[in-house]
Structure formats: C-alpha cells, structure tokens
Amino acid sequence: MVIVEGVVIGGNRLGRKLGFPTANIAIDDDLAVENGVYSSKVVVEGEEYVAMTNVGVRPSVDGTKRLLETHLFGFEGLLYGLKLRVELYDKIRDEKKFSSVNELREQIAKDSNQIKELMANG
C-alpha cells in the first residue's frame, strides 16, 4: 500500500460530467507510484470511503501534468481545499488514451464495478 496526502484542488470537472466526480490532488513527478487506476480508500475529515483512483497525466484529455484523481464511492458534497489521505491498494490497469469520451465513460464504469467487487471481497 502507498499513502498519498494532499489538499484537493480544482480540475476541469470532466469526471463530474461523466458521472464520476473526482477530487484532484497535485503530486510530484517523482512520486514512486506507476501511472494507472487503483483500488483505494480515502480518509476525509475522519471518515473513510472506498474509492477509485487514477494516477497519471490523463491522456484522453490531453493532460500533461501528473495528477492524482480519486472518486469516493458514496460521498456527496464538495472537497475543494480539504486534506485527503489516499491509500492506494491494487493497480487494476494502466492509464490509457481512449478514442472518445463515451469509451472513457464505459471504461470508468467497468473500473468502478471491478474496484467495488475487489474491495468488498477484502
């Protein structure tokens, strides 16, 4: 397990448009975590949530700066400016460039289902 802590910053809100709002945290390029999608847990203000986290440059939206984006299952509300503790567990796939927003949305939904199942089974 790798732990990343940081303050939530604003993003382009694409995750929200896709039905998976994310909390974004700026990370150092030298963070010793491979780019990809991870099962995770996030602690915010003492509450723990199962989460889906992407570490990388977001090639489908022509991103260039490395970023951690995490979607907290069951969380409602805004996280901007709050400090999060993100615990990365299993890498489920590499980061990849998708040919369309719909293809990206479909893959995120698959990732979500896989992570929920993985975390439910321990």
Question: In which residue ranges do the predicted regions lie?
Answer:
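Phosphate/ribose-recognition catalytic cores of enzymes acting on nucleotide-derived substrates
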Residues: 3-122
